[in-house]
């Protein structure tokens, strides 16, 4: 009787724990989390500073929409990394004793919501950036006249609100986020799934993530093919494509990083949701795919840091010098963004502005 009475007060909280466990190297996990969070915060902070400076420079120009979305993506990565990393370090510092420091499951719910949001929102933003560039390259006049910064901000808000809604679905459905087998993170229920609703959350998360990656791939492929066709057909607008190529290269970098980092975790969640694999047999593998997914938040900002026009230009010069080729004048990279976009978009507003300037000068 005394044994039963001592267990009963703990049982409500223990129901939130996974019934399986993962063997982890404690010291390695703690140091990994601290170093990982520090590097991620510094990387995203540097990328935010670069993108904000570029956005202020091109605020009324052709790159403003792209830079706005890119800044939102990096800011999302920054706060997701900061919040999730802080909670993870706290959990390790508390010896992963969830029953002691989170009896009401509030911290686990916050952790789970942040995990889902910081996972889906960057993928959505990456696909939205790919769509924006695809329209900008294939339909430049429509993009220049119809898609304004106000519209981009509305789409950005819609994407963020949708990601928040998906993250809040279990709470709205009176379900709890579960402490996973490693006791270091919270997510949807992944072991001993018997309810269709628990499967639905996993499959919805995996489907939305894979759909975002698929949209990014298709749009980036269309954009790249369109630019290559213009390049081989005519050299008339070669000067107007430098910024297009810069943004497309960055998008391709984001897409590759997202696919490599997120695909294993999304496929694993889909497999668990469809009961193809048992979570008990893949606990360590699931934790490994989760760490791969979180690497996306570190690598994303370096795409913008390293794949900028200035860096690519210097890399181009160094490569040609190393190959013993005479360095030609890179006038493609030297035109302003507004002139480039006007040439590509074929908007003939220049005569009107010239008339106005002539009238004012006289």
From Swiss-Prot:
Residues 1-31, 91-109, 176-198, 268-285 are extracellular. GO terms for biological process: adenylate cyclase-activating G protein-coupled receptor signaling pathway; inflammatory response; positive regulation of cytosolic calcium ion concentration. Disulfide bonds join 108-186. Gene3D superfamilies: Rhodopsin 7-helix transmembrane proteins. Glycans are attached at residues 4, 19. It is found in: Cell membrane. It is a multi-pass membrane protein. The chain crosses the membrane at residues 32-54, 70-90, 110-131, 153-175, 199-224, 251-267, 286-307. Signal peptide: none annotated. Pfam families: 7tm_1. Belongs to the G-protein coupled receptor 1 family. This is Prostaglandin F2-alpha receptor. It comes from Bos taurus (Bovine). The gene is PTGFR.
């Amino acid at each position: 009787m005394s044994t039963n009475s001592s267990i009963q007060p703990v049982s409500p909280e223990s129901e939130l724990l996974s019934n399986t466990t993962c063997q982890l190297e404690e010291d390695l996990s703690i140091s990994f989390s601290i170093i990982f969070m520090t590097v991620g915060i510094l990387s995203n902070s540097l990328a935010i500073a670069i993108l904000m400076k570029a956005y202020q420079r091109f605020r009324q120009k052709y790159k403003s929409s792209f830079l706005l979305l890119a800044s939102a993506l990096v800011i999302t990565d920054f706060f997701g990394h900061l919040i999730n990393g802080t909670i993870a370090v706290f959990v390790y510092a508390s010896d992963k004793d969830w029953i002691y420091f989170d009896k009401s499951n509030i911290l686990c719910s916050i952790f789970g919501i942040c995990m889902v949001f910081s996972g889906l929102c960057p993928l959505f933003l990456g696909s939205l950036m790919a769509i924006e560039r695809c329209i900008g390259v294939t339909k430049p006049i429509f993009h220049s006249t119809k898609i304004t910064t106000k519209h981009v901000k509305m789409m950005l808000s819609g994407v963020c609100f949708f990601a928040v809604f998906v993250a809040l679905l279990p709470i709205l459905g009176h379900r709890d986020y579960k402490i996973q087998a490693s006791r270091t993170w919270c997510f949807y229920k992944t072991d001993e799934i018997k309810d269709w609703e628990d499967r639905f959350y996993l499959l919805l998360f995996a489907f939305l993530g894979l759909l975002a990656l698929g949209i990014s791939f298709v749009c980036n492929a269309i954009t790249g093919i369109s630019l290559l066709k213009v390049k081989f057909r005519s050299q008339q607008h070669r000067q107007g494509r430098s910024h297009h190529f810069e943004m497309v290269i960055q998008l391709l970098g984001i897409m590759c990083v997202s696919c490599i980092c997120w695909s294993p975790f999304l496929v694993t969640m889909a497999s668990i949701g469809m009961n193809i694999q048992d979570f008990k047999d893949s606990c360590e593998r699931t934790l490994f795919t989760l760490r791969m997914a979180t690497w996306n938040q570190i690598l994303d900002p370096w795409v913008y840091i390293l794949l900028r026009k200035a860096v690519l230009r210097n890399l181009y010069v160094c490569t040609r010098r190393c190959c013993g080729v005479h360095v030609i004048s890179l006038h493609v990279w030297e035109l302003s963004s507004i002139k480039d976009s006007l040439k590509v978009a074929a908007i003939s507003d220049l005569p009107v502005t010239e008339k106005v300037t002539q009238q004012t000068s006289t």
